[in-house]
Amino acid sequence: MKQKVVSIGDINVANDLPFVLFGGMNVLESRDLAMRICEHYVTVTQKLGIPYVFKASFDKANRSSIHSYRGPGLEEGMKIFQELKQTFGVKVITDVHEASQAQPVADVVDVIQLPAFLARQTDLVEAMAKTGAVINVKKPQFVSPGQMGNIVDKFHEGGNDKVILCDRGANFGYDNLVVDMLGFSVMKKVSGNSPVIFDVTHALQCRDPFGAASGGRRAQVTELARAGMAVGLAGLFIEAHPDPEHAKCDGPSALPLAKLEPFLKQIKAIDDLVKSFGELDTEH
């Protein structure tokens, strides 16, 4: 079955093409740290021949605690993204939380992301669609894979069909997430075979029910990423940090930056193998 291709400049994203890495840091902690992390990603992905898009948030508007670090904000965040693009020649993805942010952010970055908690907010979806930018839609933890078709339809009605879907797990009782591997193919089907990617970092979240920040299971990042990529996906979404224990957001789920290259070698090997098989129709 023909898979839809979404182009991010010269990077083509599709379920049957070599996977694209959407990777970086959870939130912009400082200009210098962003430069350091981006440079490492660029070096490793160029060495391994993996198409790459840098990821970071300029504002974490949905932190659990009012006391948690949110980021540098829109103006300073866009300055950092512009410098990263100019210095390393990378594409950039970041999330928006309000309709008023959509166009200013789309003027700077290459992909704008619809956060999972906001994925059904029609005014935000319409504002993002109007930018004409490539869109990455995070599947909410509380929405079934089949319901993602309705969100995609909103973007299409807004005149934008450059949509990528991203799974980051589903609620499993309170304060825990699991990944339904069967859901990836459902998301492909209901979206007209749009590219589907896997956010392995946030799928590893778990939390203390009375805590102020999410916990995580980064010790299991490799096995979960292997399983997801074995399905045959358009891309992998992952966050890394040189010192996860002291990251300002989601450190417990972040891959240690020093482990990025050996991790990606395994992921690329699995992706290459799975996509060498071709499609096998077992329904008929």
Curated annotation (Swiss-Prot):
Catalytic activity: D-arabinose 5-phosphate + phosphoenolpyruvate + H2O = 3-deoxy-alpha-D-manno-2-octulosonate-8-phosphate + phosphate
Domain of life of the source: Bacteria
Presence of the UniProt keyword Lyase in the record: no
The family this protein is said to belong to: Belongs to the KdsA family.
EC number, as in UniProt: 2.5.1.55
Signal sequence, renumbered to the chain: none
Keywords carried by this UniProt record: Cytoplasm, Lipopolysaccharide biosynthesis, Transferase
InterPro entries: Aldolase_TIM, DAHP1/KDSA, KDO8P_synthase
The name this protein goes by in its record: 2-dehydro-3-deoxyphosphooctonate aldolase
GO CC terms, sorted: cytoplasm
Subcellular compartments: Cytoplasm
Organism: Citrobacter koseri (strain ATCC BAA-895 / CDC 4225-83 / SGSC4696)
Sample GO molecular function, one term: 3-deoxy-8-phosphooctulonate synthase activity
GO biological process: keto-3-deoxy-D-manno-octulosonic acid biosynthetic process
